[in-house]
Amino acid sequence: MITLGITGRSGCGKSTVTAVFAAHGVPLVDADQISREILLPGSPLLPVLARRFGADILYADGSLNRRLLADRAFAAPEGKAALDSLVLPEIIRRVCRLKQAAREAGASLFVIDGAVIVGTDAEKECDHLCVVTAPFATSVARIAARDGIAPEMAARRLNAQTPEEVLLARADLVLRNDADLASLEAAAAVLCEQLQAEGARKGGADTSL
Protein backbone atom coordinates (compact mmCIF):
# COMPACT_ATOMS: atom_id res chain seq x y z
CA MET A 1 0.00 0.00 0.00
CA ILE A 2 1.14 3.50 -0.83
CA THR A 3 0.45 6.36 1.59
CA LEU A 4 0.13 9.78 -0.01
CA GLY A 5 0.09 13.04 1.90
CA ILE A 6 -1.80 15.84 0.16
CA THR A 7 -1.16 19.34 1.46
CA GLY A 8 -1.17 22.94 0.36
CA ARG A 9 -1.88 26.45 1.50
CA SER A 10 -5.37 27.79 1.98
CA GLY A 11 -7.25 28.44 -1.25
CA CYS A 12 -4.99 26.22 -3.34
CA GLY A 13 -7.68 23.76 -4.43
CA LYS A 14 -6.64 20.88 -2.16
CA SER A 15 -10.24 19.90 -1.45
CA THR A 16 -10.86 19.52 -5.19
CA VAL A 17 -7.92 17.14 -5.44
CA THR A 18 -8.94 15.03 -2.46
CA ALA A 19 -12.50 14.81 -3.82
CA VAL A 20 -11.09 13.24 -6.99
CA PHE A 21 -9.20 10.64 -4.96
CA ALA A 22 -12.32 9.90 -2.90
CA ALA A 23 -14.34 9.47 -6.12
CA HIS A 24 -11.79 6.84 -7.17
CA GLY A 25 -12.57 4.89 -4.01
CA VAL A 26 -9.38 5.80 -2.18
CA PRO A 27 -9.69 5.71 1.63
CA LEU A 28 -8.54 9.00 3.08
CA VAL A 29 -8.29 10.72 6.41
CA ASP A 30 -8.78 14.45 6.90
CA ALA A 31 -6.22 15.41 9.53
CA ASP A 32 -7.77 18.86 9.85
CA GLN A 33 -11.16 17.30 10.65
CA ILE A 34 -9.54 15.05 13.26
CA SER A 35 -7.98 18.12 14.87
CA ARG A 36 -11.47 19.57 15.27
CA GLU A 37 -13.01 16.32 16.54
CA ILE A 38 -10.45 15.77 19.29
CA LEU A 39 -11.34 19.17 20.77
CA LEU A 40 -15.08 18.61 21.01
CA PRO A 41 -16.79 18.79 24.44
CA GLY A 42 -15.86 15.83 26.60
CA SER A 43 -12.42 15.40 25.09
CA PRO A 44 -9.75 14.56 27.69
CA LEU A 45 -7.51 17.07 25.94
CA LEU A 46 -9.65 20.04 26.96
CA PRO A 47 -8.72 20.15 30.67
CA VAL A 48 -5.07 19.69 29.70
CA LEU A 49 -5.30 22.67 27.37
CA ALA A 50 -7.13 24.67 30.04
CA ARG A 51 -4.29 24.10 32.50
CA ARG A 52 -1.75 25.30 29.95
CA PHE A 53 -3.60 28.21 28.36
CA GLY A 54 -6.09 29.28 31.04
CA ALA A 55 -9.41 27.97 32.33
CA ASP A 56 -11.30 30.67 30.46
CA ILE A 57 -10.57 28.99 27.10
CA LEU A 58 -13.51 26.74 28.04
CA TYR A 59 -17.07 28.03 27.99
CA ALA A 60 -19.43 27.24 30.87
CA ASP A 61 -20.85 24.29 28.91
CA GLY A 62 -17.39 22.77 28.55
CA SER A 63 -16.91 23.61 24.89
CA LEU A 64 -13.73 25.22 23.63
CA ASN A 65 -13.35 28.90 22.80
CA ARG A 66 -11.20 28.19 19.76
CA ARG A 67 -10.56 31.84 18.99
CA LEU A 68 -9.22 32.54 22.49
CA LEU A 69 -7.07 29.41 22.40
CA ALA A 70 -5.64 30.45 19.05
CA ASP A 71 -4.95 33.98 20.29
CA ARG A 72 -2.96 32.65 23.24
CA ALA A 73 -1.24 29.82 21.42
CA PHE A 74 -0.06 32.04 18.58
CA ALA A 75 0.96 34.95 20.80
CA ALA A 76 4.46 33.48 21.13
CA PRO A 77 6.40 30.64 19.48
CA GLU A 78 6.48 28.63 22.70
CA GLY A 79 2.68 28.76 22.85
CA LYS A 80 2.30 27.25 19.39
CA ALA A 81 4.91 24.61 20.26
CA ALA A 82 3.01 23.73 23.44
CA LEU A 83 -0.28 23.42 21.57
CA ASP A 84 1.29 21.19 18.93
CA SER A 85 2.90 18.97 21.57
CA LEU A 86 -0.51 18.35 23.13
CA VAL A 87 -2.66 17.98 20.01
CA LEU A 88 -0.48 16.47 17.28
CA PRO A 89 0.25 13.12 19.00
CA GLU A 90 -3.46 12.32 19.23
CA ILE A 91 -3.98 13.28 15.58
CA ILE A 92 -1.14 10.97 14.54
CA ARG A 93 -2.51 8.10 16.64
CA ARG A 94 -5.86 8.34 14.87
CA VAL A 95 -4.25 8.67 11.45
CA CYS A 96 -2.18 5.53 12.10
CA ARG A 97 -5.24 3.55 13.19
CA LEU A 98 -7.10 4.47 10.01
CA LYS A 99 -4.04 3.77 7.89
CA GLN A 100 -3.70 0.31 9.40
CA ALA A 101 -7.40 -0.39 8.82
CA ALA A 102 -7.02 0.58 5.16
CA ARG A 103 -3.99 -1.69 4.81
CA GLU A 104 -5.81 -4.63 6.39
CA ALA A 105 -8.75 -4.03 4.04
CA GLY A 106 -6.37 -4.45 1.10
CA ALA A 107 -6.31 -0.85 -0.11
CA SER A 108 -3.61 -0.04 -2.65
CA LEU A 109 -3.56 3.67 -1.78
CA PHE A 110 -4.29 5.66 1.37
CA VAL A 111 -4.41 9.46 1.55
CA ILE A 112 -3.61 11.75 4.46
CA ASP A 113 -5.23 15.11 3.73
CA GLY A 114 -4.00 17.98 5.86
CA ALA A 115 -2.92 21.59 5.77
CA VAL A 116 -0.20 20.83 8.33
CA ILE A 117 1.74 17.73 7.28
CA VAL A 118 5.20 19.06 6.51
CA GLY A 119 7.45 19.02 9.56
CA THR A 120 5.15 16.83 11.67
CA ASP A 121 5.03 13.09 12.36
CA ALA A 122 2.27 12.85 9.72
CA GLU A 123 4.94 13.45 7.08
CA LYS A 124 6.81 10.37 8.31
CA GLU A 125 3.73 8.26 7.56
CA CYS A 126 3.81 9.24 3.88
CA ASP A 127 5.54 7.43 1.02
CA HIS A 128 4.84 10.41 -1.24
CA LEU A 129 3.98 14.04 -0.51
CA CYS A 130 1.89 15.98 -3.02
CA VAL A 131 1.66 19.75 -2.74
CA VAL A 132 -1.20 21.56 -4.46
CA THR A 133 -0.24 25.08 -5.54
CA ALA A 134 -2.13 28.05 -6.93
CA PRO A 135 -1.21 31.64 -7.82
CA PHE A 136 -1.25 33.91 -4.77
CA ALA A 137 -3.96 36.20 -6.16
CA THR A 138 -6.17 33.22 -6.99
CA SER A 139 -5.85 31.82 -3.48
CA VAL A 140 -6.60 35.21 -1.93
CA ALA A 141 -9.76 35.56 -4.01
CA ARG A 142 -10.93 32.07 -3.04
CA ILE A 143 -10.32 32.63 0.66
CA ALA A 144 -12.11 35.99 0.59
CA ALA A 145 -15.13 34.51 -1.20
CA ARG A 146 -15.25 31.37 0.93
CA ASP A 147 -14.93 33.09 4.32
CA GLY A 148 -16.67 36.36 3.48
CA ILE A 149 -13.67 38.51 4.38
CA ALA A 150 -11.81 41.36 2.73
CA PRO A 151 -9.01 40.42 0.31
CA GLU A 152 -6.52 42.20 2.57
CA MET A 153 -7.46 39.93 5.48
CA ALA A 154 -7.29 36.89 3.22
CA ALA A 155 -3.81 37.90 2.10
CA ARG A 156 -2.65 38.29 5.71
CA ARG A 157 -3.94 34.82 6.56
CA LEU A 158 -2.16 33.33 3.57
CA ASN A 159 1.09 35.11 4.38
CA ALA A 160 0.97 33.69 7.91
CA GLN A 161 1.01 30.12 6.60
CA THR A 162 4.02 28.00 5.70
CA PRO A 163 5.65 29.54 2.61
CA GLU A 164 4.91 27.65 -0.59
CA GLU A 165 8.59 27.23 -1.36
CA VAL A 166 9.05 25.36 1.92
CA LEU A 167 6.26 22.95 1.01
CA LEU A 168 7.61 22.46 -2.51
CA ALA A 169 11.07 21.69 -1.17
CA ARG A 170 9.63 18.69 0.70
CA ALA A 171 7.29 17.47 -2.05
CA ASP A 172 8.03 14.80 -4.60
CA LEU A 173 4.72 15.41 -6.39
CA VAL A 174 3.15 18.74 -7.36
CA LEU A 175 -0.27 19.62 -8.76
CA ARG A 176 -0.36 23.18 -10.08
CA ASN A 177 -3.81 24.73 -9.97
CA ASP A 178 -3.13 27.51 -12.47
CA ALA A 179 -5.73 26.70 -15.13
CA ASP A 180 -9.41 25.73 -14.88
CA LEU A 181 -11.04 23.32 -12.45
CA ALA A 182 -11.38 20.58 -15.05
CA SER A 183 -7.63 20.64 -15.67
CA LEU A 184 -6.89 20.22 -11.97
CA GLU A 185 -9.38 17.37 -11.68
CA ALA A 186 -7.91 15.62 -14.72
CA ALA A 187 -4.36 15.92 -13.38
CA ALA A 188 -5.49 14.61 -9.99
CA ALA A 189 -7.22 11.64 -11.62
CA VAL A 190 -4.08 10.71 -13.56
CA LEU A 191 -1.96 10.92 -10.41
CA CYS A 192 -4.49 8.88 -8.43
CA GLU A 193 -4.53 6.08 -10.99
CA GLN A 194 -0.73 6.02 -11.17
CA LEU A 195 -0.40 5.72 -7.41
CA GLN A 196 -3.14 3.10 -7.17
CA ALA A 197 -1.20 1.01 -9.67
CA GLU A 198 2.04 1.56 -7.74
CA GLY A 199 0.35 0.53 -4.50
CA ALA A 200 -1.15 -2.57 -6.10
CA ARG A 201 2.29 -3.64 -7.28
CA LYS A 202 3.67 -3.06 -3.80
CA GLY A 203 0.87 -5.09 -2.23
CA GLY A 204 -2.10 -3.76 -0.26
CA ALA A 205 -2.26 -6.45 2.38
CA ASP A 206 1.21 -5.99 3.84
CA THR A 207 0.64 -5.62 7.59
CA SER A 208 4.00 -4.07 8.43
CA LEU A 209 4.09 -0.42 9.45
Q: What kind of feature is each model-predicted range?
A:
Residues S15:
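Walker A/P-loop
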